[in-house]
């Protein structure tokens, strides 16, 4: 297993020194690489895979270089889409865009290895999948909010005037009938 950690959502001015200071408390670091084009992600490689797993558990979702960062174990496979997130292969967050067949083939191989380590990896994968699901829910809620706000004043007036005239005609017909 690869002892490489993907760090995503970083600001463009993040440095390898900053990352090394944050990540070295989990074990000996072999290499830190910060992407420049496009910026926003990095890889931290440890000597020992257990150190990488500890770093992921402790730092995923925490503030790194002033922003809330995503920290995941890297699978070493590049993913399409402009290079952002390349190298982590959708291990947790991007599970829904993978074919279920491909995922099963890779998973069955790892099942035959050490069960305890696999179980903790499954748990962290589930947690990150839940987090990404929550994030996408928040995003769609935000889109709905901005959509309703972005209606033009004329459109808003039109919908109000329709309901106003409807209620006026109803109240008029009620008052005309004798009680």
UniProtKB/Swiss-Prot annotation:
Residues 94-160 have a biased composition (Basic and acidic residues). Residues 3-76 form the RRM domain. Extensively phosphorylated on serine residues in the RS domain. Residues 78-93 have a biased composition (Gly residues). Keywords: Developmental protein, Differentiation, mRNA processing, mRNA splicing, Nucleus, Phosphoprotein, RNA-binding, Sexual differentiation. It is found in: Nucleus. Residues 161-173 have a biased composition (Basic residues). GO terms for molecular function: mRNA binding; RNA binding. Belongs to the splicing factor SR family. Plays a functionally redundant role in shifting germ cell sexual differentiation in hermaprodites. Required for the development of somatic gonad structures and for progression from larval stage to adulthood. RNA-mediated interference (RNAi) of rsp-5 and rsp-6 result in fertile animals that exhibit excessive sperm and delayed oocyte production, and sterile animals that develop morphological abnormalities of somatic gonads. Rsp-2/rsp-6 RNAi caused severe abnormalities in somatic gonad structures and in some cases animals were arrested or dead at the larval stage. This is Probable splicing factor, arginine/serine-rich 6. The lineage of its organism: Eukaryota, Metazoa, Ecdysozoa, Nematoda, Chromadorea. The gene is rsp-6.
């Amino acid at each position: 297993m690869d002892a490489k950690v993907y760090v995503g959502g970083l600001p463009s001015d993040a440095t390898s020194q900053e990352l090394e200071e944050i990540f070295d408390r989990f074990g000996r670091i072999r290499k830190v690489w910060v992407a420049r084009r496009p910026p926003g992600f990095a890889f931290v490689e440890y000597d020992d895979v257990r150190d990488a797993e500890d770093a992921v558990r402790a730092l995923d979702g925490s503030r790194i270089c002033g922003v809330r960062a995503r920290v995941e174990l890297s699978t070493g496979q590049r993913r399409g889409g402009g290079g952002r997130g390349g190298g982590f292969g959708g291990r947790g967050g991007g599970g829904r865009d993978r074919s279920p067949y491909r995922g099963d083939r890779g998973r069955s191989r790892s099942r035959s290895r050490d069960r305890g380590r696999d179980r903790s990896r499954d748990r962290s994968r589930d947690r990150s999948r839940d987090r990404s699901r929550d994030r996408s829910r928040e995003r769609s809620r935000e889109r709905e909010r901005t959509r309703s706000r972005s209606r033009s004043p004329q459109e808003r007036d039109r919908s109000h005037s329709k309901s106003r005239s409807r209620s006026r005609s109803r109240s008029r017909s009620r008052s005309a009938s004798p009680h």
